[in-house]
Design a protein with these regions (language model features):
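Membrane-proximal envelope and lipid/glycan-remodeling enzymes
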Residues: 2-499, 544, 625-710
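Basic, ligand-binding patches in group-transfer machinery
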Residues: 475-679
């Protein structure tokens, strides 16, 4: 009895523990970078609101800014057609950035997002973990409302996230996770009203739908009809033509209920209207469709409809069943759905039908079909229907035999986990890597955003699976600095893969660091280079000179003719070597020209580094991020990137190399960017692990105790 009192199950406390466990769990997989143009655009607006108190987009224009979707406002200034809600969600990220800016005495970056520092990107990349956690606990509560027991609701709500296409959107910086989490909450609160008959649930349902309205774009109208129908089906409204008084009473009740819901929606509708009026002079205009160009017909051509709907459902590259295999349970066991689920079956089916039709026929331009969700992992536009269809799947699961669970449900869960792990571990952008820009079928041109969706060998899951196995095979080369802790930490391009070996492109000034191993001290250091011709007409010889620990090694200077390889055996006294952090500076110039680089003509490759006759690994990725905050707070000094080379696009390209060629996890970033503050990241990583373990343990205790008492 005493034990039961001490461990009394408290639903609200459990929900809080479950929320924080999911928050820390999803945060663990965050990127540490903003990985979408949409995300940068929303974040740019947040920074403008916070620092400059305006909705106007940054005035900096290309080439010093990343391209954004812009539209002229009523005042002639440029604005984004994006929603306000997701920009407000980035306020913690900008406040975190502002804290570091004040500590470092720096002004906010003017050319954001091209020049963006790590604090704001780190926290921004974790934003959707918060909304993912909201969605999980909402699904848990939703499932319990169908009398699915605590343990099973817990298991299924978590599976609903990690084995479906929802998982990657707790990571990728798009507004869809915020949209779907509050939409699911709005539907759940309608169900709560039908069960408890408390008007407050209608009001809070309206509040949740109000958040949906301001989150993203005008697609908030798509769920409106299923939302209203769900209310009518849940409340079992039945009009009788012969009973006028009864009909009036029912209609009066509907109006009263609608009023409570409208009270919740109203403040957000006013915010939405004011936001649009300030920008575009019209309360209902969000900027979409106001740009110049050919006006698209209301009804698209038949090929658009057929191709889009088929693509959403069955294409090898973007089928919703490939990215969320669990949806197949609805086709395998639809006959197990109970009659009591009629409100959910009808409303959720209508919602799915609307999205399949509307997304399937969606066109961004006359020759651009956008049904596939554009640049994303899976179809981001279609994730809205996943939580609702999963509620039906969870009810089916209740009726399954052990055989069906092990041989149907479980395999689909595992396949889904694998597919989502590809989108979690790697940036989704690299699925297009090494693909030709266009292919031609007769007179039709298909770009790399189209044909991989229809040809299986180029599909994202197939292509990224090959990347996974290759990356795992090569993982030692990415992180192993060897016995001498060798790092090509500045002025070297990413490894150029020739198949049998990899070379490193060398900038005009490059730096290598290494330690002097106590067991096998360095007495011989040799570097081999190639002066590679990119075009035959460029025939400049290259001179390479060396400086070790601030001492010039004049006798080691070499001159390499065009299209030749040559070794440089460094001549130095072992007395100048330190036990740790020896710095070798490599200077390159071309004889007969004042150009430090001959882009698209010639390049210098480092082929091999040998220490004491043994080849060393030169494939680790060690770069400066070029962080003004780190420079001020930690006294970081930059040599090539951030000093000699300050072109923002060149530095952006450095970030892109690390982003594309490493595992996409925030806590791995300091292993590649040596100017990231390792103490800050270590503390955050430790807190992340502690959060997962602490709240995971709380949940485990709840499960054990609940299992004994049920």
């Amino acid at each position: 009895m005493l034990k039961q009192k001490l461990f009394k199950f408290k639903p609200n406390k459990f929900i809080a523990n479950y929320f924080f466990f999911c928050l820390f769990f999803f945060t663990f997989f965050a990127s540490g970078m903003v990985d979408s143009q949409d995300g940068f655009q929303y974040l740019a607006i947040t920074r403008r609101m916070y620092y400059d108190h305006t909705f106007e987009l940054p005035v900096k224009k290309p080439p010093h800014n990343v391209h954004m979707n812009i539209f002229p406002g009523k005042d002639g200034k440029i604005y984004s057609p994006t929603g306000l809600g997701y920009s407000l969600a980035f306020l913690p990220a900008v406040m975190f950035e502002d804290l570091f800016l004040k500590l470092s005495g720096r002004e906010p970056l003017a050319t954001f997002p091209l020049e963006s520092d790590w604090p704001v990107l780190l926290v921004a990349s974790m934003t959707n973990a918060f909304f993912g956690a909201i969605l999980v606990v909402t699904l848990y509560q939703y499932l319990k409302s169908f009398n699915i027991n605590h343990k099973r609701s817990l298991l299924l709500s978590f599976i609903a996230m990690v084995s479906t296409n929802l998982f990657v959107y707790t990571k990728h910086v798009y507004p869809h996770m915020m949209f779907v989490s509050f939409l699911t909450l709005a539907f759940y609160l309608l169900r709560q009203y039908s069960l408890k008959k408390q008007k407050k649930h209608l009001f809070f349902s309206g509040l949740a739908y109000g958040v949906v309205i301001i989150t993203y774009n005008p697609t908030f109208v798509l769920p409106a009809l299923p939302f209203a129908l769900y209310y009518l089906l849940l409340t079992k409204v039945k009009f009788n033509l012969k009973k006028i008084k009864s009909n009036i009473k029912i209609l009066k009740q509907i109006i009263i209920d609608a009023f409570y819901g409208f009270l919740g929606i109203l403040p957000f509708w006013l915010i939405y209207s004011c936001f649009n009026t300030v920008r575009f002079g019209n309360a209902t205009s969000a900027g979409y469709g106001s740009s110049a160009g050919t006006k698209l017909p209301l009804i698209p051509p038949p090929y658009v409809i057929i191709e889009g709907i088929w693509g959403v459902l069955f294409s090898p590259g973007r089928s919703i069943f490939i990215y969320t295999p669990l949806l197949l349970m609805l086709f395998l066991f639809w006959w197990k759905l109970k009659k009591r689920l009629i409100p959910e079956i009808i409303s959720f089916s209508l919602l799915s039908l609307i999205y399949v039709l509307m997304i399937g026929i969606n066109r961004g331009a006359e020759d651009f079909l956008a049904w596939h969700g554009e640049v994303s992992w899976g179809n981001r536009y279609m994730i809205v229907i996943i939580p609702f269809l999963f509620i039906l799947i969870a009810n089916i699961y209740q009726t399954l035999s052990k055989y069906n669970k092990y041989f149907a449900f479980l395999p689909l869960v595992l396949i889904g986990l694998y597919v989502q792990s590809l989108g979690i571990l790697f940036p989704y952008q690299i699925k297009r890597g090494a693909l030709p820009n266009d292919i031609y079928i007769n007179e039709d041109s298909l770009n790399f955003g189209e044909y991989p969706n229809f040809i299986p060998r180029y599909s994202a899951v197939f292509k990224m699976s090959k990347v996974l196995f290759k990356r795992l095979k090569n993982i030692k080369n990415i992180y192993d600095h060897g016995d001498y802790n060798l790092k090509l930490y500045d002025g070297y391009d990413s490894p150029f893969d020739l198949g049998w070996t990899k070379w490193r492109g060398t900038m005009p000034t490059a730096h290598i660091s290494f330690d002097n191993n106590k067991k096998d001290k360095i007495h011989d250091l040799t570097l081999q280079f190639r002066n590679h011709q990119l075009i035959p007409s460029s025939t400049y010889s290259a001179q390479i000179s060396f400086n070790l620990n601030d001492q010039n090694l004049d006798q080691s200077t070499i001159i390499i003719p065009a299209d030749k390889d040559q070794e440089a055996k460094l001549q130095f006294s072992t007395d100048i070597l330190k036990d740790q952090n020896n710095i070798l500076k490599v200077d390159t110039n071309y004889i007969g020209t004042s150009s430090a680089q001959l882009k698209k003509k010639q390049t210098i490759f480092l082929q091999i580094i040998r220490i004491n006759g043994l080849a060393q690994n030169i494939n680790t990725l060690d770069y400066p991020y070029v962080s003004p905050i780190s420079e001020s707070l930690y006294g970081t000094e930059y040599h090539y990137w951030g000093n000699e080379e300050q072109n923002l696009w060149e530095i952006w390209n450095v970030h892109s190399r690390v982003f594309e060629e490493t595992f996409d996890l925030w806590w791995l970033r300091p292993l590649h960017y040596w100017d990231f503050p390792k103490d800050v990241f270590s503390v955050l990583f430790t807190l992340n692990i502690i959060g997962i373990v602490f709240f995971g343990n709380k949940i485990w205790i709840h499960i054990l105790f609940k299992a004994k008492t049920e």
